[in-house]
Each structure stands twice: as structure tokens, then as C-alpha cells.
């Protein structure tokens, strides 16, 4: 039987809806489903429900505890005091947890950042998606200590992925290998696609590539560990990561991007006269995400939206919203006769639309709120 995964609440949370679950700080819970941003858990009273994933943290299993302990004994690493900003959640009497004081240090190994993380305490390190950090210490409570851009601090380990198996991995060597791969691509001229930018993009770190709307680039790599970003080369030879939803693959690919491109074609789309919500001015039926992006960028104003059939799930829908900088897309699932967006449920699509005209459909980490203002015209 599969080993059950235990998580511990980092903060109190009061359920806002029936499907959610009240939790208390330091409460132990059993993880049932972590496939979405809200995790389904079970408490000691055998009640189940959804909680925000950033309100809980995984605890190591007994098997992993044994492995860490054996490794620690082999390396001769002693117990040290854990970082004070992380709450002590493991009970000393429960041997299914690793002692929170155990850690591995002097690792000096590179890791790839999978998600953005904003430091909440002075001793934490903010992470930027797509960058590399040097892991210096690993604490058994799931927090690692590392350095980036001259800053040192703690961060949650599940926000990064290790580049290699060697604990003494050479970060400079890793960068050299990547640079060699880029040079190899330049020499061989291997181009996966030629793409054109739909709108401008300003990089937030050294690995990303700045570009303007209309720029043409060669796609030279599609990183497996970050499928939402492609490595591209501009006409001037500069290479970097670009968000793939900011570009469109040109239908008639030139052999190289040095040729003068023709602008990508985008058919004029309009509200659909067929489909589940035919006749509603916000329903565009079977249009692609790319077509929705193009229409919103060409004709829309901030807050304009449209609803389209989902490309990946035939019975579901997507809300596409014009937003400053980057448009947003929200999946709406049809479960029997109920329309679900995140944890919220609506009896009709019209009810969903009216709700998000009054309540924010998206709130950023900085507190920016986005609403459905009016349908695209």
C-alpha cells in the first residue's frame, strides 16, 4: 500500500466554502490530492476538504528520515539548530519525522527555480522563476539555504529542482556546459521554430531575453524542466528564455530569422452563433487561446473579456481577460450542471460572469485585483 503523506499547517485557515476545511497552525493532516493549487487533505477527525497549498508543508516520511539519518552518520554531520523563522511542527515523540535540527551543509550545488517566491522574513531568499540558485544547506524541515545574486537566505525546497545528483556540483561548470550548448546551436544552425513576438517582454533576470512586439526569433531549445519557456535567439545573436505564450510560430518558416518576416495572420473573430452559449456577446465558441490573445491585444481594453470553448477539455470553457502586461486565462469546468472556477461554483455561466464583474477574478501578490469589466467588442 502506498505510504501516506503527512502535511503540517503553517497558519490558521478558516474555510470560506463547503468544500474547504478549517485548519489550525501546526495541525497534522493527511494529503489526499496535491494536483492543484488547493490541496485536498484529511484531519484527525476524518474530515476532508481543500486548503490553500501555501498554508501547509510536507513532512518527511519515515523512510526518508532513515535515509537522511544514515547519510548524516556516514558524512559525520552533527545536529545543529534549525533556522529560527521556521515553526517547530514535528513532535519529538513521533519517530515518523526527521528531527528538525538535522541538516546537510556545505553542499554548493546548483538548483533551477521552478516558481517565483517572495521572501516573507529577513532571513529568507526571494526566488525568480527560471534563475539558478546555489544550494548551501538542506534542512530536514523542507527549507534550504542558498545564494543568488549576492543574497543568501532560506527558501522552500519544493520551489526548485536540483540540476544534478552530485552534492558537490560545480555551478560554473554547469553554466559553461549551457554556454557550450548555445554555441553549438549557433554553429549548427539548428532551429526548431521561427517565432514572432505578439507583444513586448522585459526580462526580470539574466537568463531571460528582452524583445519587442513584432521581433522575429529562432527557437533553439524547449527546456523539459520548464515547458512554459522556450530558449530563443534574436537576429543580433542574443540568446535567452522567452515565455512561449508571448510568441506565435510563423506558418511559413524562413530558414533563418535573418530574413525579413511577414506579420502573422490573425482572422477577425466575433461572437459565435453556434455552441452552448450562442447569442451571448461574450461567447466566442471554438477559438484558440492564440486567437483570443490576438483579438484582445488588437481590439481590447483592460478588463475586456471573452469566453471560449476549452481546447484541452471538450466540455469545459476558458475565460480570456485583457490585462496590463499579460493577458489572463481562467479554466471553467462543467461538472454535471455546475460551472466551477477554482473552488467556486455557479449554476449558470451568466451567474459566473456577473459575479466576477463585482468580485475580483484574480488578485496578484502585490494586491492588484482584476475584474471582468465588459465583453470584447
Curated annotation (Swiss-Prot):
GO cellular component labels: cell-cell junction; cytosol; endoplasmic reticulum; nucleus; plasma membrane; protein phosphatase type 1 complex; ribosome; vesicle membrane
A single GO molecular function term of this UniProt record: protein kinase inhibitor activity
Domain SH3 residues, every copy: 2-61, 106-165, 190-252
Gene Ontology annotations of biological process type: actin filament organization; antiviral innate immune response; cell migration; ephrin receptor signaling pathway; lamellipodium assembly; negative regulation of insulin receptor signaling pathway; negative regulation of PERK-mediated unfolded protein response; negative regulation of T cell receptor signaling pathway
Modified residues (Phosphoserine): 85, 91, 96, 166
Keyword Coiled coil included in the entry's annotation: no
Cellular localisation: Cytoplasm; Endoplasmic reticulum; Nucleus
Pfam families, sorted: SH2, SH3_1
Main location: cytoplasm
Domain SH2: from-to ranges: 282-376
Modification(s) after translation: Phosphorylated on Ser and Tyr residues. Phosphorylated in response to activation of EGFR and FcERI. Phosphorylated by activated PDGFRB.
Keywords: Acetylation, Cytoplasm, Endoplasmic reticulum, Nucleus, Phosphoprotein, Repeat, SH2 domain, SH3 domain, Translation regulation
Superkingdom, taxonomy of origin: Eukaryota
Residues modified to N-acetylalanine: 2
Quaternary structure, from the entry: Interacts (via SH2 domain and SH3 domain 2) with EGFR. Interacts with PAK1 and SOS1. Interacts (via SH3 domains) with PKN2. Associates with BLNK, PLCG1, VAV1 and NCK1 in a B-cell antigen receptor-dependent fashion. Interacts with SOCS7. This interaction is required for nuclear import. Part of a complex containing PPP1R15B, PP1 and NCK1. Interacts with RALGPS1. Interacts with CAV2 (tyrosine phosphorylated form). Interacts with ADAM15. Interacts with FASLG. Directly interacts with RASA1. Interacts with isoform 4 of MINK1. Interacts with FLT1 (tyrosine phosphorylated).
Domains as described in the record: Only the first and third SH3 domains seem to be involved in RASA1-binding; the second SH3 domain and the SH2 domains do not seem to be involved.
Function: Adapter protein which associates with tyrosine-phosphorylated growth factor receptors, such as KDR and PDGFRB, or their cellular substrates. Maintains low levels of EIF2S1 phosphorylation by promoting its dephosphorylation by PP1. Plays a role in the DNA damage response, not in the detection of the damage by ATM/ATR, but for efficient activation of downstream effectors, such as that of CHEK2. Plays a role in ELK1-dependent transcriptional activation in response to activated Ras signaling. Modulates the activation of EIF2AK2/PKR by dsRNA.
Protein name: SH2/SH3 adapter protein Nck1
Source organism per UniProt: Mus musculus (Mouse)
Lineage, highest ranks first: Eukaryota, Metazoa, Chordata, Craniata, Vertebrata
